[in-house]
UniProtKB/Swiss-Prot annotation:
<feature type="binding site">
    <location>
        <position position="75"/>
    </location>
    <ligand>
        <name>Mn(2+) 1</name>
    </ligand>
</feature>
<keyword id="KW-0464">Manganese</keyword>
<feature type="compositionally biased region" description="Acidic residues">
    <location>
        <begin position="607"/>
        <end position="616"/>
    </location>
</feature>
<dbReference type="GO" id="GO:0006303">
    <property type="term" value="P:double-strand break repair via nonhomologous end joining"/>
</dbReference>
<dbReference type="GO" id="GO:0097552">
    <property type="term" value="P:mitochondrial double-strand break repair via homologous recombination"/>
</dbReference>
<protein>
    <recommendedName>
        <fullName>Double-strand break repair protein mre-11</fullName>
    </recommendedName>
</protein>
<feature type="binding site">
    <location>
        <position position="301"/>
    </location>
    <ligand>
        <name>Mn(2+) 2</name>
    </ligand>
</feature>
<dbReference type="GO" id="GO:0000014">
    <property type="term" value="F:single-stranded DNA endodeoxyribonuclease activity"/>
</dbReference>
<dbReference type="GO" id="GO:0007095">
    <property type="term" value="P:mitotic G2 DNA damage checkpoint signaling"/>
</dbReference>
<dbReference type="Pfam" id="PF00149">
    <property type="entry name" value="Metallophos"/>
</dbReference>
<dbReference type="GO" id="GO:0030870">
    <property type="term" value="C:Mre11 complex"/>
</dbReference>
<dbReference type="GO" id="GO:0042138">
    <property type="term" value="P:meiotic DNA double-strand break formation"/>
</dbReference>
<dbReference type="Pfam" id="PF04152">
    <property type="entry name" value="Mre11_DNA_bind"/>
</dbReference>
<dbReference type="InterPro" id="IPR003701">
    <property type="entry name" value="Mre11"/>
</dbReference>
<keyword id="KW-0158">Chromosome</keyword>
<dbReference type="GO" id="GO:0030145">
    <property type="term" value="F:manganese ion binding"/>
</dbReference>
<dbReference type="GO" id="GO:0000723">
    <property type="term" value="P:telomere maintenance"/>
</dbReference>
Amino acid sequence: MCGSDDSFDDFVPDSQEPASSRTRNQDHLDDDEVPCSQRPDAANDTMVEDLDEGDEPAHDESEDIIKILVATDIHCGYGENKANIHMDAVNTFEEVLQIATEQKVDMILLGGDLFHENNPSREVQHRVTQLLRQYCLNGNPIALEFLSDASVNFNQSVFGHVNYYDQNLNVGLPIFTIHGNHDDLSGKGLTALDLLHESGLVNLFGKHSNIQEFIVSPILLRKGETRLALYGIGSQRDDRLVRAFKNNSISFLRPNAGAEDWFNLFVLHQNRPRRAMHRSTGNFLPESLIPQFFDLLIWGHEHECKPDPQYVASSEAVGDGFYILQPGSTVATSLTPEEALQKNAFLIKIKGRKFASKPIPLQTVRPMVCDELLLDKIPPGSRPILKTDRPKHTDGRYIDEIAIEAKINEMITTAKAKRRPRQPELPLIRLKVIYDGDWLNITPANAKRIGLRYENVVANAVDMVFIKKNNKPKEGKLQTENEKNITEMADEMGQVSATNLQTIINDYFINQPLVDQMTVLKPIGIGRALEQYSAIEEGGLATSANRNFDSCLMHQIDVVRKTLKKMPLPPINDPSDLDKFRDLITKDLYDMKKADSERFKNPVADVEMEEDEDDPQYYMPPQSTSRTNYASGSEDEVANSDEEMGSSISRHSKQPTTRGRGRGARGAGASRETTRGRSNKVVSTRQIDSDGFEIINDSPSPPPASRSTRGKARGKSAPSKKRDLSFF
């Protein structure tokens, strides 16, 4: 939406941009600009290595260049209960703010997960607020013009303007951020970021309360001749967002006139690689679903830093591709090789339709070294006589512990050699010890006992050593399907994620004999519970997870009771009829299990099964005070999910009306529907709304809705009164 003070009349009419206007600039390069090794030789490439247009520019180049400092997954509050690392995330966040000040950027863009928890501790909120006030509130001039309708971009707020347009605040460094899966919505749809937004310290955008339809309105910014359209979608469940793209229920608004003059930047917080092997959506967002008009994507949630923007070619005969920048986290929240890579913030310069990217190494990140040690040979003469004995050296020390400690000392030496002056002194060490060959039948060493010997040398002594036995199936014994799944889904550190474990749980219960399958509790509920319990950090409490699981279980019991009440009540005239009634209830429960089993086993119903996860009878609410990796639903979504599931078929069959997003109709509370999704062909549709924005859809139309006859009355018997099952 355009602000009332701005006009698009002077813009070039919307047309296909000539290829020559987006060719890569071949002028002289700055030494500090890192070239993109994956940049294609495309005629309409937007990434350049230098934004200078010549030796004698007509005016100061800074008047047209938008400078943005990008960082994602800061996780303030991570490890606050651990002695050595409790301030790591906050200290690095301060470094990000310092870099922004030194580089004199126009704005900071955060890609989600500023906080590690939805409800961070008071100490963490206090420290973050201090830093934001210290670095963001000052008298520095801001050259960015805010052109869009702030009441639409920040519709969750009562303040209808960007924070640096507030006359009561003196903002010198604006921050724009979306929410991630750690600081996501819960309860009444609020997060800790909402407090920072309402206090004027950050600008929170990309919140979407309507999970049936996503309408993404960009933040429009201008500096000199450069126009930036900033799009954002806060963290959503990947299955839900993929369905939105495939069902054509997500729209990105664009300026009607001069749309090709805007640099389109999209920030999101989703799984990028496939995280589940046995699901149709894979628990990730495929890059192929993203519209092609974007120039650059900032991809949050993935902690591995990829310093070079990666080009994604267009899948269409006509159309440009886009670049994806994956900044990675600024703090390590897991002990994996990907987290041990160099952490960076990124300086993005935008001029016209071109951009340049430069990684800035972070100097305060705690050093980390990850490695593996394979134990497969026992030295001659050291083999124990009894299986319960462990091989010892002549000096009485255990041979495996000698090898483990030698490897740890080598890793610590490496960490100290690479340590920079501003980095914390104690490093993070993760050694994966694999017992194989001669060591398979030997009792492994005690990992924690070894770690405690390094308590004052490393930051993570307790979980420094990870021990794994490379067990193989016995001869003549076939590996079960679930064992194969666990082996395939285990990551490089030998651990299985909660999301993949959900798939294993589903497969196990679905493949059980029908009589042994569960009636009330659903596998999805168990998987969600395990996900929350696994997210509890060491020393944390499981109170919230216990409460959520109890609530889920009681709700599922209530669903079964209500379903049984809807079934016909037979006549009861004598005591023998009570036995028949009891048998009928048993049969009803069996029929319910059978219907569920057939539906979940049917491969073509895979999408329906994913949609069922939004249903309260399957739903496990997210834990609001601990880390949740992939679930991002809220309690409000639980309350409304029955209505959403019931309306998922009729919403496409209703006679559509115009959307009515005009400025005069805002806040009127009128329902709005669109004509999206009514074509059976994969097309790119365009519409113009009353504010001069262009609605685009580059996603395929939804498949026809399936219908189920489950729950209808048996035979042709006349309807009877509902059962009274208050005793159930």
